[in-house]
Amino acid sequence: MNREKSPIPGDGGDGLPPQATRRAGPPAAAAAAEYDISRMPDFPTRNPGHRRAHSEILSLPEDLDLCAAGGGDGPSLSDENDEELFSMFLDVEKLNSTCGASSEAEAESSSAGAAAAVAAAAAAAAHGARPKHQHSLSMDESMSIKAEELVGASPGTEGMSSAEAKKAVSAAKLAELALVDPKRAKRIWANRQSAARSKERKMRYIAELERKVQTLQTEATTLSAQLALLQRDTSGLTTENSELKLRLQTMEQQVHLQDALNDTLKSEVQRLKVATGQMANGGGMMMNFGGMPHQFGGNQQMFQNNQAMQSMLAAHQLQQLQLHPQAQQQQVLHPQHQQQQPLHPLQAQQLQQAARDLKMKSPMGGQSQWGDGKSGSSGN
């Protein structure tokens, strides 16, 4: 904004309280403030028709540095003039921090101008020259914030890390902001508390998720072990089932073989029964004629024995005739007389031996013939 439009304390511009309610400051301080403001760089031009481009509920980050360049140009709940005064105040602080090698007179004039600006901003915020539309806040109106609490809450920056030191500086700047614009400081403090609560809820949620993940991992490990045991049992049962199937097939083959053997035996038994029945029908006739061949065989054997004895006697007689031709002639002429004469001892012994031989042969031949007859009758 141009210097002509920048409100200066005691200028009577819009947004400042009337002349009657203004505090009368020393003329030297006013001149010093006017001199410092004239040396400040021009502010960027802003469109007065669109003053609030951002949402009021937009939360600010925790590490926001309020002393950065252009930090006071953001929207606030106060009037436009109050925002411009606060921006001027921050720019004056920046100039004081960067110009440390300036003279003591310039430092005193800068501090005097800053004090005058702060006093004017506080008076404008307290009395309010004109009522404007106030946007609703997302927090309770009864909640208030004290600068002493904010300053006390921020510990010393000695021995802290960069992030903690930045937070402490931010808290200190927020305390200074509470003196100038308490509503904006209240909103920033509420946003910080909400962010802290959200972060805490997020951490709890993450911890709960980690606990659930660990529980699920433990269950997965247990289930994996159980699955391995079940797979091993299943493999054993499958092998046993295969062995039982092989045994069942072997038993079925044995049963089929037994059935075939039984059928063969039944057919053979039936055939033997049929053959036995046929033989039983023709066996009676053969038994009736079984005794006659035996009788004929016995008579024939006796006849053969007699013939053998006669042949032996004839041979013996021929020998006697050759040895004793005279005795043979007498025996031929007188056979009866020859029979009456006693035989020679040698001749008698030979005759007895021949008779014994005939007796031994005759029982054996009769028994064999009798056995042959029995076997023939039983076979028939």
UniProtKB/Swiss-Prot annotation:
Entry-linked PROSITE patterns: BZIP
Matches recorded under InterPro entries: bZIP, bZIP_RF2, bZIP_sf
Domain of life where this protein originates: Eukaryota
Tissue expression summary: Expressed at high levels in levels in leaf sheath, moderate levels in leaf blade, but not in roots. Predominantly expressed in vascular tissues.
Stretches the record annotates as Disordered: 1-57, 326-380
Comp. bias intervals (Low complexity): 16-33, 326-355
Annotated spans, Basic motif: 183-204
Protein name as catalogued: Transcription factor RF2a
Origin species: Oryza sativa subsp. japonica (Rice)
